[in-house]
Every structure is written in structure tokens, then in C-alpha cells.
Design a protein with these regions (language model features):
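Residue-level signal for secondary-structure boundary sites
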Residues: 81, 112, 175-177, 210, ...
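Active-site metal-binding loops of divalent metal-dependent hydrolases
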Residues: 78, 107-109, 172, 218, ...
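N-terminal, active-site-proximal structural segment of metallo-dependent hydrolase catalytic domains
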Residues: 1-154, 164, 226-227, 234, ...
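Residue-level detector of short, conserved catalytic/binding motifs and their immediate flanks
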Residues: 71-74, 102, 167, 200, ...
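Short, surface-exposed loop/turn motifs at beta-strand boundaries within globular domains
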Residues: 64-71, 97-99, 160-162, 195-197, ...
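Catalytic lobes of large eukaryotic enzymes
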Residues: 124, 128, 132, 136, ...
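Extended hydrophobic secondary-structure segments that form protein cores and membrane-embedded regions
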Residues: 73-74, 103-105, 154-160, 167, ...
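Structured beta-strand-rich core segments of catalytic domains in phosphoester-bond hydrolases
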Residues: 51, 116-218
Length: 412
């Protein structure tokens, strides 16, 4: 007698292709995307046992307290370049004191050609990036000020949609405090559905506080009116992003189902908003480091002032050069050298990090100097207020069979 798995019929290749084209996924697949990333990503052994195979411990709440973990958030459009194995990421990831959580988002992790957009997903570059990040974060070193050894970081979530790639890393000692990991993808590319543009959102709970990290790649273009298409992308991402509805085992009721339902929200990515000036005018202001004059013509700032997009969202002060577009392996803006045939693009801050809601305080907002692609990475460090159960007596309950959400661990 054949087992159940062997009797299941795989959907025809045409149906699989249509599902990819239109980013159609069932509820089970949405869970599976996260679970595969966690349990098979090399760091997920602590979550590999099924929820129905073990008992759950709940905390009887008697008092609350607050934590203030630091979160390092970064976005980088790598231009479809597969990272060399010896690529040094120290200047990017080790530019700040150790954070508790690292949220690292990429765009164009693969070239956005027809094969990658319409065909099978190419995850080879993603594996290389994960390996390099793990090696960098966990390299032996000491903090000069305290002499403390490096904390060890685990990859708790990762998700790829064509060229967009989002990863979340946490300190080892925090792994049991991260629960309810879920993912939502929205395609905004060809036909408004394909994944060459769009977003990946990861939802999670840290103790009693919900977090949502949104990594996006919005519509490109520097023609007048293109900013309105980017506004539309943002509105569609907010409208269409939905996380699988499940009950929170901590007893807090239903988990957030939309991006804006979360307590702490950070949006990162290549937003592609440009500077509404000529190439020469923008280049002259950039060379003079006159950021304020450039930012007066920044499309994102203008659209926010007119309340057409990201109303109520915050962004840190920009005090660094534009992040796009640079010539290969150079600090020269693309198109400056008339002897070289290359696309001429007005210098702009395409790569941004924003946040929404209370409980988040940005400690720094900087630009990296890697010349790997035509974009420069942008990163910020946040201090986040997190509610937790300080003390209480544990009560034991049996887990529901088949549930995919994480266990409520016994807190100290």
C-alpha cells in the first residue's frame, strides 16, 4: 500500500507557473514558506519539532515590565550581483555596536530577467548571502569598551520573492522569546502581480509585542508621474498584505492580520523615489554636500507633505550622500563620465527606512560605502520598547494538533 504522500498528485507545471506569475498562495503555503525557512535554514533546529508533539507552558501573568532591545535594520539593492565568497561585510554589519536583532533586506538579489521573473526561483545567491552574514555576525571578536565576547546570532526567518530577500537574525539567548512568525508577499511587478517588484513582510511577536518588517522594491523610473505609481505600490502593499489568522497562545487573542495592526512597524527597501531636479543640478548640490536643498526636491518628502503616501510614518534625518546611481566599482555618479556608455540617472535617495507607531526610537541612520552595486546600503539602529511578563506561575496545557505557531516558552 502506498503512503499518503505518494498518492498525492502534484499540480501540473502550468498551474505552478500561473501561481508564481500571479503570486497566488494558499494559507498552508504561507505558513510553509516561513517554516521551511526556519526549520531548514541551518539555524532552525530549535523549532524543528512539531507543535503537536510537545506540551506547552503558559505563564500566569501577574506583572509586566519592559525591555529595550536594539534592532539593526538595513536595505541594500545589490543589482543582481552574486556576492564573491570573500566579500567583507564588516563595514556594513559591524559599523555599530552589537544589536539584539538584525533585519536585513535585499533587492535584486538575482538579475531581474525573464528567466528569474517567470521561471523557477534561483536561491543560490540567497544562500551565499546567508552564509556571509552568518560568518560576519558570528566572527570571533571582542567589544573594545567592555571586553565582552561576540554574541552568537541565529537566523530565525528568511523569505525570497524573485529578487526581494528578507532575513531576520536574533541573539541565541532570545530565540525562545520570538514567536508567531508569519509571512506575506505582494507582487507589484508585471501586470501588477509578478514578483519582480513588490514586498515581503515578516510578522513576529517578541515577548508580548508584535513587530512587522516590510522589505519592498517599488516601481522604478524618473519621469514625471512615476512617483504616483510608487504611491500606488505602497497603498496596494498595505491593502493586500495579509498574515494567516491564528490565535496567539500567549492568551492575547488574535494576532495582527495586516501590517498596520502591529505595534512596531519598520519599512525598508528600494522605494525608488527620486530627486525632482536635472542630473546636473542634483550632481552639483551633491558635490557641495547641500543635502537640505536636495531633500527639498526629494519626491518621498514631497508626497508625504501632500499626505499622498506614508502619512504618519517617520524617517530619520538624512545626512549622507544619495544612495543611487553609481558607476561600477566607483564613487562616481553614473553618467558623469561622458566617455563611458552608461545610464545617466539623477542622484537620489532611493533606499530608505521608515517606521510607524510608538515604541520605536531611531538611534542612527547611515549609509554604507560598499561599491558592490550601483546602490549603497542604508542602515539604521532602533531601540524598541517590548512588553514582557516579569514573573508568574506556569500552568501546563496541551498544544493543539497541527498548529504552526510557536510555543509560549516559560519565562524567567
Amino acid at each position: 500500500m502506498s503512503d499518503e504522500s505518494s498518492t498525492r498528485r502534484k499540480p501540473p507545471w502550468s498551474k505552478c507557473l500561473v501561481r508564481k506569475w500571479f503570486n497566488i498562495k494558499s494559507k498552508g503555503q504561507l505558513f510553509q514558506d516561513v517554516d521551511d525557512s526556519i526549520s531548514k535554514g541551518g539555524d532552525g533546529e530549535w523549532r524543528s519539532s512539531s507543535f503537536s508533539e510537545r506540551e506547552t507552558w503558559r505563564v500566569k501573568k501577574t506583572r509586566r515590565g519592559d525591555l529595550m532591545p536594539e534592532i539593526f535594520v538595513s536595505t541594500w539593492n545589490v543589482g543582481g550581483i552574486c556576492p564573491p565568497l570573500r566579500l567583507n561585510l564588516d563595514d556594513w554589519l559591524l559599523s555599530s555596536p552589537f544589536a539584539d536583532i538584525y533585519v536585513l533586506g535585499f533587492q535584486e538579489i538575482v538579475p531581474l530577467n525573464a528567466g528569474n521573473v517567470l521561471g523557477a526561483e534561483n536561491n543560490a545567491p540567497a544562500k551565499k548571502w546567508v552564509s556571509l552574514i552568518r560568518k560576519t555576525l558570528n566572527s570571533p571578536r571582542e567589544q573594545a569598551a567592555t571586553g565582552a565576547m561576540t554574541p552568537v546570532y541565529l537566523l530565525v526567518a528568511r523569505k525570497q520573492m524573485v529578487g526581494i530577500f528578507l532575513t531576520v537574525w536574533v541573539r541565541t539567548e532570545m530565540k525562545d522569546d520570538v514567536r508567531n512568525l508569519r509571512v506575506s508577499c505582494v507582487g507589484r511587478g508585471l501586470m501588477g502581480r509578478l514578483g519582480n517588484k513588490g514586498s515581503i513582510s515578516i510578522s513576529m511577536s517578541l515577548h508580548e509585542t508584535s513587530f512587522c518588517f516590510v522589505c519592498c522594491h517599488l516601481t522604478s523610473g524618473q519621469r514625471e508621474g512615476d512617483e504616483l505609481r510608487r504611491n500606488s505600490d505602497v497603498m496596494e502593499i498595505l491593502r493586500r498584505s495579509r498574515f494567516p489568522p491564528v490565535d496567539d497562545l500567549a492568551g492575547e487573542g488574535r494576532l495582527p492580520e495586516t501590517i498596520l495592526d502591529h505595534s512596531r512597524i519598520i519599512w525598508l527597501g528600494d522605494l525608488n523615489y527620486r530627486v525632482a531636479l536635472s542630473h546636473n543640478a542634483a550632481r552639483s548640490l551633491a558635490q557641495a554636500r547641500d543635502w537640505s536643498s536636495l531633500l527639498e526636491n526629494d519626491q518621498l518628502h514631497k508626497e508625504q507633505r501632500f499626505r499622498r503616501v506614508f502619512e504618519g510614518w517617520k524617517e530619520g534625518k538624512i545626512s549622507f550622500p544619495p544612495t543611487y546611481k553609481y558607476s561600477a566599482n566607483s564613487d562616481r555618479f553614473s553618467g558623469d563620465d561622458l566617455k563611458v556608455r552608461e545610464k545617466r540617472r539623477t542622484p537620489a535617495w532611493c533606499d530608505r527606512i521608515l517606521w510607524y507607531g510608538s515604541g520605536l526610537s531611531q538611534l542612527s541612520y547611515l549609509r554604507g560605502d560598499s561599491k558592490l552595486s550601483d546602490h549603497r546600503p542604508v542602515f539604521g539602529v532602533f531601540s524598541a520598547e517590548v512588553e514582557l511578563v516579569c514573573c508568574g506561575s506556569p500552568t501546563k496545557s496541551m498544544a493543539c494538533s497541527g498548529s504552526r505557531i510557536e510555543v509560549e516558552e516559560l519565562l524567567p
